[in-house]
Structures are given as C-alpha cells and as structure tokens.
Amino acid sequence: MAQEKSQGKSKGKPKEKSKKDAIAGMTREQLEEKLRAWEESELADFITRQPESQSEYKTASGLPLNRIYTALDKGARGDGAADIGLPGQYPFTRGPYPTMYRGRLWTMRQLAGYGTGADTNERMKYLLAHGNTGLSVDFDMPTLMGYDSDHAMSRGEVGREGVAVDTLADLEALFDGIDLTEISVSMTINPTGWILMAMYIAVAEGRGYDLNKLSGTIQNDILKEYTAQKEWIYPPKPSMRLVRDTIVYGARNMKRYNAVNISGYHISEAGATSLQEAAFTMCNAIAYVEEVIKAGVAVDDFAPRLSYYFIAQADFFEEVAKFRAVRRVYAKIMKERFGVKKPESMRLRFHCQTAAATLTKPQHQVNLMRTAYQALAAVLGGAQSLHTNGLDEAFAIPTEEAMRLALRTQQVIADETNVAAVIDPLGGSYYVEALTDEFEKRIFDIIEQVDDMGGTIKAIEQGWFQKEIADSAYDYALRKASGERPVIGVNKYVEEGETPEVETHPYDPETEARQIAALNKVRDDRDNQKLSGLLDRLKTVAGDDSQNIMPITIELVKAGASIGDIVESLREIWGTYRETPVI
C-alpha cells in the first residue's frame, strides 16, 4: 500500500515496468524465444495470407535488412553504449557538438556560380536576402582546369556552369559588398584550389582583414578527382604537395579556415554506393593526414581544420546510418591510428548536398520531394551545413526561383518540423544502431583492403577505386533499367507523351567576350616584367619540395597573374597526368 501511495504522489511519472514486461529487461534467451514464437505464430500465418512484396530486402549499398530489429541485434544492446556515446564526446556518433542544432542550426549554404564575378555576386546577395546563412561558389570548367577564358579550350564554356575567374580582379568583383569576416564562404574548386585560396587571401588582405577571422572552406580534394570527378592537371605526387601546402599554410595563418574539404559527394555521383562513398573518403583522408605529417607538422596542429563533404542519397535510413558511422570511424582513425590528443582533431564536421544524380527531367516537380527527404536525412544525420538542389537542375544550373524553393525546403525543416529540438533523434533505434554498426565494420574492412594494396595512391594508380565505382554504377544502371530500383517518372508511374515545361537559367552569349575583355585589361595594366620574375621564382619553389608554394602564389595573384599563367608555368615543371584506362 505504501508503494502504491508513493506512486500516486509522483504525478506524471510513468510506472516502472517489470522486467518480465519490458523487452530490454528480458534475458537474451527469453527475447530469442519471444521472437521465435512470434515468427512461428502471428508472422507465419499472416505471410501465408499476405505475402511480402520482395523475397529479400537490402539497402541501396546492398546491405541485407532484417524484417524487424530488436535488442538482439548488434549495436542495439547495452554493451554498445560506449560506441553510441553522447553528442560532442568521443566517438562522436551522435554529433560533433554537445548542443548540436539546439545551439546553432546547420548553415544553409546554397550554391551560386555563373557568368562573371559580378553576375554571381548578384545571385549570392539574392540568396542572402532570402535567408541563406553561408555562401558557396561553383566555378566554370576553364577555371577548374586552369585555362584562361581566351584559351582555345575555354571556348563556349566561359561562365556556363559556374563563375569565370581568371585574375584577382574577378574574385574582388565576386565578393564586392560582402563582408568576409561576417559570413563563411565555401569554394568548390580542386585542381586550381591553391590559386583560388591565394586569391581569397589577397582579397582579405586588401581589405585589411585579419586572416584568423576568416571562416570558410576551399574544396581542394584532388584524390577524389583521380577516382571520380576526373578533373586534374598534374600527376598525383605534385598535386598532393599542393594540398599539403595549403593545409599547412592554413593551419599556421588561418585558424578558422578549412584548407581542404575531403569529399565523398563526387564519389557517389560517379556511381559509388553510400558504403563506398564513406570508405573511400576515409581512405583519402588517411592519405592527406600522412602527407602533412611527412612535412613535419604535428597532426593536432592541422587536423581540427580538416572538413568533409558528403551526399544525401535516396535510401533514407542508410544515409542517416552512414553519417553516424563515418563520424565514429573517423574518430577512431584519428585517435588509434594517428594518436591525436585534441578532441577537435577527432571530430568530423561535414557539409552535405542532396543528390543531383537522382534528379529527373520527367515529372521534374517530383524533384522537390526527393530533395526534401534527402535534406531531412542530412539533418537527422547531423550535418553542419547543407545545400539543397533545385528542382530544375536536371536541365541546367538552377534559376533564382528554383534556388529560393530549395532554400525554403531547408527552412521548413528548420522552423516547422521541430526535428532540430532533439539531438540525434534516431539514436537508440534498434534498426539505426545496427545499420550504423554494420556500416562502421564494412568501412574498416575497405580501409584494410586499401592498406594491403599499399595505400590510397597505390590503389589509384592500380585503378582499383575507379573499377569499384564503375562496377557499382553499372549495377545500379541495370537495376534501374529492370525496374528493380524504382525511379518515379522514369521507370514507374511514367506519364507517356509528357513534355516538360520548365524555364531554365539562360546563358548570356556575351559572357565570354566580357570576361576576355576584363582579362585583357588586367594584362595591359600589370607590370609584366615583374610578373615574369615571379613566375621564375614559382618554378624554383615548385622544384623544391621543402618550400611552401602558397606565399609565392599569393604574390603572383596580387601582381595580376592569371590562373592560366600560374598553371602553365608549373606544367613545365610537373607535366600533366594521363590516366591508365580501367578494364
């Protein structure tokens, strides 16, 4: 009676369940017996009357799925609590920060990039006016590949799929009227990433900014170019030197800046599974860390500013598990393999983008829903920043309206769904924890396989990553063609005779002429004799692996050197890379 009275006074508290009633309180044998009895009675009888739609279920990466997950499954039991952990604590499964979105929402970082610097500046200000909380810049193919806008290889491509940048003047126009100490800027650039970083520094110094107050990211991940995106200039060894030099320079001079953004996104877009995306990205990370350590820099001095970039694909729970698992894997790699001491060095921070390759031309309005679910997976997986794709990106770069709707998608998730109120709300789910554990195990298996080949560079040179991605892409294409992998509007619920009516982003045919005119003006105004001397010094520095290439590059861009000037000078020293075909 006394116990009953005590419970009665505890108004609002649920009564404690007996261990016999609570599954978690059962012994393993009792739970196994309960599950077996359910399968043999209710389940078996029901399936005879209503068979399941598939004989077996798998994730998009091919991981087998149970019908139901219980406390019996690995990772769902109490002995996995150490690996699940708490947010902001090792191994960071539940998030890199103690308060996550309760303290600060993810950065809403919609991409912008087309035409000239002035054109993209206008789009960035439009996005800021509509609630964008970070900036992200895409560059055109000539800028990416190191060609000036008047080069023969640039014809027809200037400003078409990103902003055209030839000289420092273009970057000054790009960020005109934007305080770079008040907003973080991400620049999606790889083979010429060190030059764009030098230009960014030059813009900041020209405005009198303290470099340690700049926050932002340069993608600068050349390894995934060799395996996935296929945009490179130089062979792997000098290319790794460029990444190393930017990381070292950033660590010593820009305490809040991420000088590399190690990217799984492009690996996925090339056809890799989510498991491969996560594992291959970790292999690349290991290679970069080893490269910087070889330069004599202590890992805890640069690791806190390593950043990551992942995709949010269509398989919702697999994506959430991927994000959670890769945080844990990274923490263990940094602690156990590299011996880091700082928690910040073990903490994986990532930008996320919804999956462009899932966007379709047929029934393109459905892309809004695809993107929304992918964005929700990114948020539930704990992303630090997010770009949501425009519904029209299967046709062209997005219009202002498409970008506004994509941004509103994030804002609805942030402000209307209340999902940001609880940290890692799917944590503790038997299914999510089991899938997270399985992802972790398989990621480490792939890392071990690459280690056995001699590391990431050796695996690239052997074409191993490339073949793995190609095989996965082919498998997905077959499954989509057969209908095994449904795509609404493409192989399911197809509307015959549909003619998409969509207003695409227009390309201004005068962009190329305007950009070339601006380039020629810089060439006319600069001190070409001084420039020639600086380019000679660049070659000397490039030939001496002990020197950092960033200071001379900063001098060059301040002197009016174009990207093409710098790239062509280094071709004379390092040559160009030719990929061995993968059979």
Question: What residues fall within each predicted segment?
Answer:
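Gly/Pro-rich turn-and-neighbor structural signature
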Residues: 33-66, 71-80, 197, 237, ...
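Secondary-structure transition/capping motifs at alpha-helix termini
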Residues: 129-135, 177-183, 203-215, 248-258, ...
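Mobile "lid/hinge" segments at catalytic clefts and subdomain interfaces of large enzymes
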Residues: 220-225, 231-234, 239-297, 369-447, ...
